[in-house]
């Protein structure tokens, strides 16, 4: 077995969920699931597929593709537009029922390719654009590869394109399967299936991922292929594993797997459709987040899938900023709910600071208070704050303050209070700086 390039991966959960399904009349009002993330210049693009709740309005009972953007790899993410980025084809065409599993590749400046799966048994299609936000034009000779399952990712290495998918679907458990590879010299093809498929198969009953894998993205960095994937049990409890390869064909699972254990993420049943970016020394991992539901919730649990992020540090020391709360305004005397703040995971953190920033009205008399509430399990939080501080204050100014907080528990949340009795506070931001030294 090839020795892993990263001996250890240190997991820190992101501010999850980072994107939830849209409203009841939105095109993604019933469900959202993760596609790949592209960084282009200073902007991050999180592609995903969604399913409408109001199918009559949208005229389709299937997935369509959208995108959210951010200036930071952990968000906050903003949906682009109020329509899908790419919709299904006309009735009777090969992708008229659904399009999903977006994988976007930047070929060069002003030239982008979007690969996707369409209908069942899921052929692969291609669309082109001069901007990552589109408009996208479908390739006139689609599909470029027939019957290749759920698309995971496409990378270009040495002039050759490597396409990875979950195929065949349902081989190991419902909706899960092994990973397969196809290659081509051009995005349009012809695509040739690798004769050694599958390139990543289930190793045997009793392993943590013996139910197979959901589609997963692929990275290429400094001579190595990297994939983070959702591995499942038959009970659909999915954690995240990591595998690597020097040739894109023979993959080795990391001995530390699973590198993201769903058991350490409170209330979560699994992570699927996993993709990643690498900004050394940090991997930013993106996935569909599924929730544990009770028996009386199961009938309404369709769509209880949101988008999530995780950080995996490849070395120590490390430090990074994580957006925690972003509010356009906080009304006079208002106090945020604890549920409005995502959990801040501190299990692998020994350096923790919070930075508050906001803008005050010219006639404001008081400022912003920040309270930190601890939890040992991420489900129940103390009723008394473990830390409290007031942001810097000056009427009519944008003020900020950074305070170190003792990371003595596994999780923390923040509650914000406007101390002013008559004036709202604008442009409120709270950022956690997390690290290990």
Segments the model singles out, each with a brief description of its role:
Residues 327-346, 360-365, 396-398:
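Surface-exposed ligand/attachment interfaces on beta-rich extracellular proteins
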Residues 351-354, 405-427:
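Noncatalytic modules at the cell exterior or secretory-pathway interfaces
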Residues 365-378:
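Short, surface-exposed beta-strand/strand-loop-strand elements in extracellular ectodomains
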């Amino acid at each position: 077995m090839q020795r892993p390039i990263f001996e250890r991966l240190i997991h820190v959960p992101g501010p999850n969920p980072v994107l939830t399904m849209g409203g009841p009349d939105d095109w993604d009002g019933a469900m959202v699931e993760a596609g790949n993330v592209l960084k282009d210049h200073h902007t991050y693009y999180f592609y995903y597929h969604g399913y409408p709740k109001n199918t009559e309005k949208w005229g389709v009972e299937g997935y369509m593709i959208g995108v959210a953007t951010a200036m930071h790899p952990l968000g906050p993410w903003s949906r682009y537009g109020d329509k899908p980025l790419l919709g299904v084809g006309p009735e009777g065409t090969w992708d008229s029922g659904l399009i999903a599993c977006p994988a976007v590749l930047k070929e060069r400046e002003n030239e982008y390719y979007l690969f996707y799966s369409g209908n069942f048994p899921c052929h692969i299609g291609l669309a082109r654009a001069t901007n990552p936000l589109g408009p996208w034009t479908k390739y006139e000779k689609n599909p470029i590869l027939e019957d290749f399952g759920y698309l995971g990712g496409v990378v270009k290495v040495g002039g050759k394109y490597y396409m990875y998918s979950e195929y065949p679907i349902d081989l190991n458990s419902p909706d899960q399967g092994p990973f397969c590879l196809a290659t081509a010299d051009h995005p349009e093809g012809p695509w040739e299936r690798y004769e050694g498929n599958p390139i990543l198969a289930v190793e045997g009953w009793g392993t943590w991922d013996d139910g197979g894998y959901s589609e997963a993205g692929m990275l290429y960095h400094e001579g190595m292929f990297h994939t983070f994937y959702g591995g499942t049990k038959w009970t659909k409890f999915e954690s995240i594993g990591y595998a690597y390869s020097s040739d894109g064909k023979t993959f080795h699972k990391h001995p530390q797997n699973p590198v993201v254990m769903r058991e350490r993420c409170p209330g979560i049943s699994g992570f699927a459709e996993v993709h990643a970016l690498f900004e050394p020394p940090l991997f930013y991992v993106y996935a569909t987040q599924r929730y544990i539901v009770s028996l009386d919730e199961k009938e309404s649990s369709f769509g209880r899938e949101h988008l999530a992020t995780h950080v995996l540090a490849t070395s120590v020391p490390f430090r990074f900023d994580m957006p925690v709360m972003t509010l356009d305004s906080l009304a006079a005397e208002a106090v945020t709910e604890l549920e409005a703040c995502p959990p801040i995971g501190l299990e692998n953190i020994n350096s923790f600071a919070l930075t508050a920033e906001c803008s005050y009205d010219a006639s404001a008399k008081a400022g912003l208070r920040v309270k930190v509430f601890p939890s040992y399990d991420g489900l129940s939080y103390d009723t008394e704050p473990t830390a409290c501080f007031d942001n810097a204050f000056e009427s009519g100014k944008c003020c900020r303050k950074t305070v170190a907080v003792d990371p003595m528990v596994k999780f923390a949340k923040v509650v914000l209070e406007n101390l002013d009795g008559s004036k709202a506070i604008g442009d409120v931001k709270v950022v956690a700086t997390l690290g290990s030294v």
